[in-house]
Amino acid sequence: MKIIPSAALTALLACASVVPTAAQQKSASEWTFAVSGDSRNCGDVVMPSIAAAAAKNQAAFYWHLGDLRAIYAVDEDYQSSPEHRGKVIEKDAYLKDAWDDFIQNQLGPFGSMPVFVGIGNHETIPPRTREQFAATFAKWLDAPTLSKQRLADDPQDTTPKTYFHWIQGGVDFIYLDNATFDQFSPEQMGWLQGVLGRASSNKEVRALVVGMHAALPDSLASGHSMNDWPTGAESGRRVYTELLNFKKKTHKHVYLLASHSHFYMSGIFNSASWKANGGELPGWIVGTGGAVRYALPPDSSLAKEARTKVYGFLLGTVHKSGEIDFRFHEVNKADTSAGTIERYTPEFVNFCFDRNTAFVEPAEPAHK
């Protein structure tokens, strides 16, 4: 499988050739990072624009929160690429290509920008497994930043995992794996407790940013979250409570990021359940990397922000105090590069932005 050179060149140049204006320059004590998830269906069209915008905003890294490719069916962008357009695609051939397609067409445009890749539930849809994901994405899961942190925590921990963390610029970034119905496992919970214990006593850590695929339970979007399975609900509530206690004990900032639901929402833990059980932690859903867009949930009016039929990413600006400002950066059809339009055709780009939606009926069973 090959990517058209002109499309790749255009995307890479878009990332590399931007010169920030004075208004975009950050003070020496501020820096930015970019986050989104769910880039199946139309991610090959949308993600190059996200990469270009992340570079323009001087993001130190991009963090993907999982669901890279559909796996249960052929992604529309894969079907619409020049190599496959108008052809009948056998499922086995698609499965063989799917993750390489993601790496080439979605990660490639980030160029030299560091990328952290999280696992989502679509990465474990049969015949795919967590072990296959870990093997394919070993380059990212065992990147020097993650390997160094893992060995600093435990010199015997030589095997990369699908949950991980790293400390950067005073922030402990933590990725939790809730891709299957047995998570959070006791092993992962024990690992997280160790991370939180070290962060509590580490004066250099001023904030936690905890990312995962499905949102923790009892949010305003609980209908497509860790509420979907008993172990998820129980262990997810324990994690939320531990993070609440961490914040109260240390007075350090705590932020929660998820995707899984294909819309943008902030203030997702402003729910009656958490108001009655310890309080709200700042939380966001940003499943806006190219997947079919879903209707907003019934309680979305209680959120600070709630938008659907949008693509984009969350841009975090880290301040010296550890406080992080988050804002949603939308990418529009007009942001699509000429190379991407040429590769996928104007008609398919129009489909992605205008008709890649599933608002009337649920797009899929819960946590499929």
Where are these regions (language model features)?
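Residue-level marker for buried hydrophobic side chains located in beta-strands
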Residues: 33-35, 62-64, 117-118, 210, ...
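Extended active-site neighborhood of metal-dependent phosphoesterases/phosphodiesterases
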Residues: 32, 76-204, 223-255, 262-307, ...
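Positively charged n-region of N-terminal signal peptides that target proteins for export
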Residues: 1-4
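Short acidic, glycine-rich surface-loop motifs adjacent to enzyme active sites
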Residues: 199-221
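N-terminal active-site segment of His-dependent metallophosphoesterases
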Residues: 22-93
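A short C-terminal boundary segment appended to hydrolase-like catalytic domains
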Residues: 303-368
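Bacterial N-terminal signal peptides
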Residues: 7-17
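Active-site glycine-centered loops adjacent to acidic/histidine catalytic or metal-binding residues
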Residues: 38, 66-67, 120-121, 213, ...
